[in-house]
From Swiss-Prot:
This is 5-methylthioadenosine/S-adenosylhomocysteine deaminase. Binds 1 zinc ion per subunit. Belongs to the metallo-dependent hydrolases superfamily. MTA/SAH deaminase family. Disulfide bonds: none annotated. Catalyzes the deamination of 5-methylthioadenosine and S-adenosyl-L-homocysteine into 5-methylthioinosine and S-inosyl-L-homocysteine, respectively. Is also able to deaminate adenosine. Adenosine-5-monophosphate (AMP) and S-adenosyl-L-methionine (SAM) are not enzyme substrates. Substrate binds at E84, R136, R148, H173, E203, D279. It comes from Thermotoga maritima (strain ATCC 43589 / DSM 3109 / JCM 10099 / NBRC 100826 / MSB8). The lineage of its organism: Bacteria, Thermotogati, Thermotogota, Thermotogae, Thermotogales.
Amino acid sequence: MIIGNCLILKDFSSEPFWGAVEIENGTIKRVLQGEVKVDLDLSGKLVMPALFNTHTHAPMTLLRGVAEDLSFEEWLFSKVLPIEDRLTEKMAYYGTILAQMEMARHGIAGFVDMYFHEEWIAKAVRDFGMRALLTRGLVDSNGDDGGRLEENLKLYNEWNGFEGRIFVGFGPHSPYLCSEEYLKRVFDTAKSLNAPVTIHLYETSKEEYDLEDILNIGLKEVKTIAAHCVHLPERYFGVLKDIPFFVSHNPASNLKLGNGIAPVQRMIEHGMKVTLGTDGAASNNSLNLFFEMRLASLLQKAQNPRNLDVNTCLKMVTYDGAQAMGFKSGKIEEGWNADLVVIDLDLPEMFPVQNIKNHLVHAFSGEVFATMVAGKWIYFDGEYPTIDSEEVKRELARIEKELYSS
């Protein structure tokens, strides 16, 4: 299949050119320049690499808007956790379908998830067609985790590598909800399987632990995606740049819960690898990485207008996000995954077209025309080809009534 006769943005550092993309067996076979015979004419559009959301809790779409204007502690312990206690497997499945519907509308091809009922989240990813790195959220009390690590291992054995779209890692929630001994068990398990870890680190100013301890029990040796890192001590930046450590910067969620602004520019200047995430819809409340990208840039520019430039922002949401998750995506090049986004250039905010990359970061609403994963459309011109969206809406209506009737 050849798509194009439109502008092509190959990667974060390139400039758009007129051309087309040939796709075969889920990968990019050729990138063509000039006008060619195509199977799908995308005149008036831009094709670019898809985006990757490196931190979310997908079923929390069901909790969107339930807790507003609260501190982090009030939000989590008084509002969110009591509702989560009522979430069933079916709810997790449809909450994840809904999350993918929203993310696909915003050009996202894959996401990192930490939650429970992860087997049903995996089924939702299987059915919808996205990519995902899935982890079971892990906590313990004096070494007893209620069987959570075994659940995570079962998830790994059953789903890791599925269709080349689903990878499974391990999800210790945070150092304040996991004992040091338990964290070591988790990192040792991940290391033995060559699997990644995702964890919340230094999200709030109240977190008091020494990262040196976590480095020594496994963080140095296991690929890790660390969400937030708002209050990560700068003395560790130099160490973290030399290990397989990726920050997932979640600016909207961090601001909304009053947790502050991560020093992203300083991290990048030290050579650290930084990606972007949305967090869950209960704390954002959107799953729009284009919005997140703009917000991230503006927050850093408050100190210096040269901070977090356009190319850096685009790299964070495409190439860096894909690398963190373990996918050969984020560039339109021969042999790379056909994970693509199509954007309508007739939108008012996309004019003048000569400044297109700037618009993607600082003007675009995030409502894309189409999103492709592994050569298949998961969203195209308002439709979701892989699911029955009307059936999903009916199920979500029933779930809302069940979840909030009491």
